[in-house]
């Protein structure tokens, strides 16, 4: 019962699955998911603030997916995918998702992450390529990257949180 109450509180704080309103914004969502990933282990996936479902795995990695989350101002978080190593010393947990509903510009991202570094750029091979900017590693070794697609270069396409050194 206590765990169910904690999950409810976390969901209320994080944003609600599709269909429920909340006042949380994208930046709070990123901060809370980053904080959750810091203490994550393969056995604590169920302790994350979102309900993740195992979608596939291989010899080394579990792949999870979560339902869309509605945030304030008609923002939604979609395509929420999470990877975690099966091995204690394996790759760092990785969370990626796409914001939708409002166009988040690079200037808006830089207001929250002013020290972004260009880490990837289109090479002309596909319309699905992205330009990515990564914030400096925090004290826990986490990095947050922001990608803008060739097809819609002015609006944030996806966010990746790499939960540690690897």
What are these model-predicted stretches?
Residues 5-13:
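Bacterial N-terminal signal peptides
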